[in-house]
Amino acid sequence: MGCIKSKRKDNLNDDEVDSKTQPVRNTDRTIYVRDPTSNKQQRPVPEFHLLPGQRFQTKDPEEQGDIVVALYPYDGIHPDDLSFKKGEKMKVLEEHGEWWKAKSLSSKREGFIPSNYVAKVNTLETEEWFFKDITRKDAERQLLAPGNSAGAFLIRESETLKGSFSLSVRDYDPMHGDVIKHYKIRSLDNGGYYISPRITFPCISDMIKHYQKQSDGLCRRLEKACISPKPQKPWDKDAWEIPRESIKLVKKLGAGQFGEVWMGYYNNSTKVAVKTLKPGTMSVQAFLEEANLMKTLQHDKLVRLYAVVTKEEPIYIITEFMAKGSLLDFLKSDEGGKVLLPKLIDFSAQIAEGMAYIERKNYIHRDLRAANVLVSESLMCKIADFGLARVIEDNEYTAREGAKFPIKWTAPEAINFGCFTIKSDVWSFGILLYEIVTYGKIPYPGRTNADVMSALSQGYRMPRMENCPDELYDIMKMCWKEKAEERPTFDYLQSVLDDFYTATEGQYQQQP
């Protein structure tokens, strides 16, 4: 629809797979068609279902024997899964991406385990206070999440110096409230560690124990490790086009112009969100082509697309479940109405981070607004419905003056010429900032779509809202530049919003 200046891979010939020729994984319940979009190694199937020439990559004998310990309990959902309890030790037999084959040292049973539920013994990953692959900004978000209090802490890997670590601690400041302090952990040539050169430790575990007894120069004594949410089970890689009967719709969460959203369960075990599309909303073929692209976009700030049901209408889109629902509904709720401005800015930064990833992938969202951002239990934001707008066939939507088209969120060049680019997404992000800072109010209050189109053509922009800082309004105005090429990148927007409160978000502390 219109001109698309961002590069796209509309020709999927290299990745297209005829599902009829693909091997399937039989279970006692149904048949699953393998995900045709995944370039990762598939979760292995029994040997009699392997492709010709395909074999398990078994470890060499001298490499065998990696022992892992369970960080969380796991109840198997497939006949070939290995269930285990927290703390149970297992021997890894084969590694296959997100699913590993392992043998329990206690029960002697073998089966497949989710690799993100375990950690190798005698490594930092077994410690509840160690957070692997987490940025400094996300460390702050985790520590400020509900359930943590002053003294909560975590150890993370340094983003800038490979092999180094940092300590992040939640503190309380009467002037600024809850703040996060960061300390660099320095290493000695002999393998020891220290924060202050006055006292060194042979290992990080000993360092933690010391600072749990006394602050000794830190902002406060370390208390409880930061709460770590249980990770999502890896999705069954064989399940892309899944049977409708494998999905149980449990609770209706909302309804929109093109369908409904439900909380449901996949195979009675995995909680998911299910978007059901009204018949005729889009062609199955066009949707599947777009879904093939959507499936490859995986980032912490994007809602993950798991599977689809397309053999007959209504189409089901299966995604990860987000407990707090849409950002729009959350902002209008009693809980959301109590969120203070710094957290609202953080919501904006998280969304900018997700959009910066979409920008790097040369993709376009086309319908960025608070209704299409979801919120987790720990108040993490994730972008949803990216790319779906491209394949909607409803006349009231495809006609840009139609009643269903989101005029108030759409850039002038997209309204007038159908020219959707990542820069038209930047315009929409500016409107989304208005939604956030006004706790979910409709943009251009009191104006009709026709009024808005006319006003924009004459250079009108929404004025600054009463509780909106000048610096944030300046960002909005940058997003609403008439010339698309003059609008900022999402990478720039993320950096500005991440550091919006640099005066109060603690920099690295001096050595105590």
UniProtKB/Swiss-Prot annotation:
Membrane-spanning parts: none
EC number: 2.7.10.2
Any GO BP: dendritic cell differentiation
Residues with the Phosphoserine modification: S19, S228
Binding, ATP: L253, G254, A255, G256, Q257, F258, G259, E260, V261, K275
Topology within the bilayer: Lipid-anchor
Coiled coil stretches, renumbered: none
Gene deletion effect: No visible phenotype at birth. B-cell development in the bone marrow proceeds normally, but mice have reduced numbers of peripheral B-cells, with a greater proportion of immature cells and an increased turnover rate. Dendritic cells also have a more immature phenotype. Mice develop severe asthma upon exposure to airborne antigen. Mice display elevated levels of serum IgM. Aging mice display strongly increased levels of myeloid cells, severe extramedullary hematoipoiesis and tend to develop monocyte/macrophage tumors.
Gene that specifies this protein: Lyn
Name under which the protein is recorded: Tyrosine-protein kinase Lyn
Organism per entry: Mus musculus (Mouse)
Taxonomic superkingdom: Eukaryota
Description of how activity is regulated: Subject to autoinhibition, mediated by intramolecular interactions between the SH2 domain and the C-terminal phosphotyrosine. Phosphorylation at Tyr-397 is required for optimal activity. Phosphorylated by CSK at Tyr-508; phosphorylation at Tyr-508 inhibits kinase activity. Kinase activity is modulated by dephosphorylation by PTPRC/CD45. Inhibited by dasatinib, PP2, and SU6656.
Residue positions, PTM Phosphotyrosine: Y193, Y306, Y316, Y397, Y460, Y473, Y508
Catalysis performed (reactions): L-tyrosyl-[protein] + ATP = O-phospho-L-tyrosyl-[protein] + ADP + H(+)
Keyword Lipoprotein belongs to the record: yes
SUPFAM superfamilies reported for this sequence: Protein kinase-like (PK-like) (SSF56112), SH2 domain (SSF55550), SH3-domain (SSF50044)
Lipid-modified residues, S-palmitoyl cysteine kind: C3
Main location: membrane
Region (Disordered): 1-45
GO MF annotation, one: glycosphingolipid binding
